[in-house]
Curated annotation (Swiss-Prot):
<dbReference type="GO" id="GO:0005886">
    <property type="term" value="C:plasma membrane"/>
</dbReference>
<feature type="transmembrane region" description="Helical">
    <location>
        <begin position="18"/>
        <end position="38"/>
    </location>
</feature>
<feature type="transmembrane region" description="Helical">
    <location>
        <begin position="87"/>
        <end position="107"/>
    </location>
</feature>
<keyword id="KW-1133">Transmembrane helix</keyword>
<keyword id="KW-0472">Membrane</keyword>
<feature type="transmembrane region" description="Helical">
    <location>
        <begin position="160"/>
        <end position="180"/>
    </location>
</feature>
<keyword id="KW-0050">Antiport</keyword>
<keyword id="KW-0812">Transmembrane</keyword>
<keyword id="KW-0406">Ion transport</keyword>
<comment type="subunit">
    <text>Heterodimer composed of UmpA and UmpB.</text>
</comment>
<keyword id="KW-0813">Transport</keyword>
<keyword id="KW-0915">Sodium</keyword>
<dbReference type="GO" id="GO:0006813">
    <property type="term" value="P:potassium ion transport"/>
</dbReference>
<keyword id="KW-0739">Sodium transport</keyword>
<dbReference type="Pfam" id="PF07556">
    <property type="entry name" value="DUF1538"/>
</dbReference>
<dbReference type="GO" id="GO:0015297">
    <property type="term" value="F:antiporter activity"/>
</dbReference>
<comment type="function">
    <text>Part of a two-component antiporter that catalyzes the efflux of Na(+), Li(+) and K(+) in exchange for external protons. Shows a preference for Na(+), followed by K(+) and Li(+).</text>
</comment>
């Protein structure tokens, strides 16, 4: 009975969170544009899509609360108590890499980026080249997030100052921007945002809080957060480096 009540509350919260987006889109469609929906978008499909979003978001968030959050924190505590730093770092990398590869936002952005880059002439204008670019971009971003989580875990262990590391990261970003292809700069900067989405953020946050709660002398509020900041800046650095040195990895690059 408790799970039903909890799901009902979460459903209400999801409706409340999505309502502003629906109202904004409806206002501009009906009041500003003043045009009916296109023929390709049936009203029934629109309503069903909104229902699927609300139900899916509700189940996703509840699943995180019931399973992935506790599991991530418990694994972090178990690795620390076992004293296996090497395995913890391997787990941190695998968690960052795996959650990012599965990120729906990254999959969508990578596919669109492949189309745009091929149109710009940076790679061949073929479906194979676009698919190769999209796949390579996803791997680069996933590797960067895995690396970022490892760096963040080391920061929690060592107590390194977060602000100095983030400042250094963005200085590197600015320097690499001077040498990266113009067509990839926007994609690189956006890659830092798409990685901090529905899957990556909860898992990485659970890991950080679990570690900071277990390591003696660490404060979960001060040290447990900040991994997402690394997961935002590191993809920018990696994608810029990919643009400078790694485009030859893409099938059909020019």
């Amino acid at each position: 009975m408790n799970i039903v009540y909890s799901l009902a509350n979460q459903l209400k919260d999801s409706l409340r969170d999505l309502l502003p987006v629906v109202l904004v889109m409806g206002f501009f469609q009906l009041v500003v544009i003043r045009q009916p929906l296109p023929d390709s978008l049936a009203l029934l499909d629109l309503v069903l899509g909104l229902v699927f979003v609300v139900v899916g978001l509700t189940l996703f968030i509840k699943g995180l609360e019931l399973g992935l959050f506790p599991l991530g924190e418990n694994l972090a505590r178990a690795f620390v108590k076992k004293g296996s730093v090497a395995w913890l770092l391997i787990f941190a990398f695998a968690l960052g890499f795996g959650s990012t590869v599965a990120e729906p936002a990254l999959i969508a952005v990578a596919a669109r980026a492949g189309e745009v880059v091929s149109e710009s002439g940076l790679i061949a204008d073929t479906s194979a080249a676009q698919a190769s670019f999209a796949f390579t971009l996803r791997m680069v971003v996933a590797l960067s997030v895995g690396t970022a989580v490892v760096v963040g875990v080391l920061r929690i262990f060592k107590g390194w100052p977060l602000h100095l590391m983030i400042i250094a990261g963005y200085i590197i970003v600015l320097l690499l921007t001077l040498f990266a292809p113009n067509e990839l700069i926007g994609i690189a900067y956006d890659s830092g945002g798409v990685t901090t989405s529905t899957i990556t953020v909860p898992l990485v946050t659970a890991l950080g809080v679990g570690l900071a709660s277990t390591i003696k002398g660490r404060n979960p509020m001060l040290d447990g957060f900040g991994l997402i900041a690394f997961a935002s800046v590191m993809p920018i650095i990696f994608v810029l480096l990919f643009g400078i040195f790694g485009l030859s990895l893409v099938t059909g690059s020019t």
